Amino acid sequence: TYTREILNYLNSTDKYEIAEMSAYGEENDPRAADIPWKFYGVMPSKNAPEEVKKHYSSVPTYQFGEFAFERVCLDFKPDVVCDIRDFWMLDFVERSPFRPLFKWCIMPTVDARPQARQWIATYQSADACLTYSDWAGGVLKNQSGGKIKYLGSSPPSAHPAYHPIEDKVSLKSDFKIDPTVKIIGTVMRNQRRKLYPDLFCAFRKFLDKVENKHDYMLYCHTSYPDLGWNIPELLQEYNLSSYVLFTYICRETKKPFASLFKGAIMQSPFTGRYGATLA
């Protein structure tokens, strides 16, 4: 989503010739027909020769773009290559024989410290480095001894669309939430590495200590079912069924709404029909 917004903005300026290399797009992908910039799909097409498909599957990092990167460089001849993703998805760019011919701007995910030394070394080789937070920038500067060419943080929340709404009372009322309730929120996918059990345990301890536990709610913008935790089981384990809100989306109207957990699918308040899914 973040990369898409950046591409749309850059394209709107009419200042740049833009190309997108899509890791999970196919060569000659029909979904790219309406994209207003040059598009390169990394995956072999469905009718590609079997030896090409086997070659693509032979190296794990090929799926992140390494499979097509040299071909794209030869065809597009980029002046700047931008990578907004994790280390293991971008490190092949450092090894490219065409690396001296373009500037490399990266925005790696830095959400823990210390970072691996190999990661820091790769980040140092980039011509420019951005982060999602000032804290992450501090981690990179400290570990590299100031050698990383750090430009600053550029989070998606810098966009005006994410500007905090000052009238929180009206906002809560619009979502049918008690405006007097204080909300603690989190946005993270339901994966095993995301510590939902610890979060629910900590929130339960918090509720047990405050004077009026009904003054607080936890809001989770997450997914279920997914590859991670059994959300309803955790809610029962920590007796939080009445204290945790989730984002559901009505598939017919595309409108989001907040609700206590009602399963993976619940009735939409907009249509009265079942089909609203946990975001």
For each feature predicted by the language model, list its residue ranges.
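Conserved alpha-helical elements of sugar-nucleotide-dependent glycosyltransferases
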Residues: 1-9, 198-202, 227
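N-terminal subdomain of nucleotide-sugar transferases
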Residues: 1-27, 76
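Short hydrophobic "strand-cap" motifs at the C-terminus of beta-strands
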Residues: 107, 132, 154-157, 186-190, ...
